[in-house]
Amino acid sequence: MAPLKFCANISWLFTELPEFPQRMRAAASAGFRAVEAAWLYNTDLKELKTAKEETGLEFVLINTPPGDASAGDLGLAAVPGREQEFRQGLDLAVQYAKALDCTRIHLMAGRVPAGSERCALALQMEDTFVHNLKHAAGVLDKEGLLGLIEPINSRITDPRYFLHSPHQAAEILQRVDHPSIKMQMDIFHWQIMDGNLTHNIRRYLPMTGHIQIAQVPDRHEPDSPGELNFSFIFRLLEELDYQGFIGCEYKPQGSTEAGLEWLRKYWRSRNGGERD
């Protein structure tokens, strides 16, 4: 079985450093060969490219812009009436992805509009989401990029986020029916919403294009106290021959570097200490 590949989410890790290029260099020094990030759009693209060239890091994933974050936006793909803004954000994400040789873009669904009930808008939001994803599929297919949709739990993290379970995401992917759109499996969110991880991982891995991890419930390192046995989960993913990256999207309990012993232990157990 091939060892799993991990990437550092530099929106969550190495935040001891203020700038993304600095975090990229720190990630490379810590042994990572790849990184991902949420929103890089306030960082000069030339600086990101320079850091990438200096470190040799692979950029694995970025998100589409959130919209107006100050007004509570967290993505626009499923928000009725915001289709043009979504397309503009997608174009910007594609520009950054192409410049950074990043092949995956998380197409953020967004939140149920404030003052509205989820049940009242569910069908309209799903139709909007499917419509926007079909548009995105055409754009991404031409560019050789992969779009991802990620369920974010609505029990704890974000009660208003529209896409909140893997089952809902799978139904939407069936409606979109395009190989350029897949699922982003965040095991933290999946455990909170549904549990039953072994079954759900087996069931949905074939339609998954990226994985992210954090311990439940506090979203710290995988080896911190919590509900999940990551040794078992990693072995399961190896047995299922998962070939993609696993994003480390968690809140370090202390310094990022001190919290990476779980990863070094994994590298030692699989590669004799060599990172993959």
Swiss-Prot record:
GO molecular function: hydroxypyruvate isomerase activity
Catalytic residues (positions): E150 (proton donor/acceptor), E249 (proton donor/acceptor)
Coiled-coil portions: none
EC assignment: 5.3.1.22
UniProt keyword annotations, A-Z: Isomerase
An example Gene Ontology biological process: glyoxylate metabolic process
Known catalytic reactions: 3-hydroxypyruvate = 2-hydroxy-3-oxopropanoate
Function: Catalyzes the reversible isomerization between hydroxypyruvate and 2-hydroxy-3-oxopropanoate (also termed tartronate semialdehyde).
Family: Belongs to the hyi family.
Name by which UniProt lists this protein: Putative hydroxypyruvate isomerase
Species this protein is from: Danio rerio (Zebrafish)
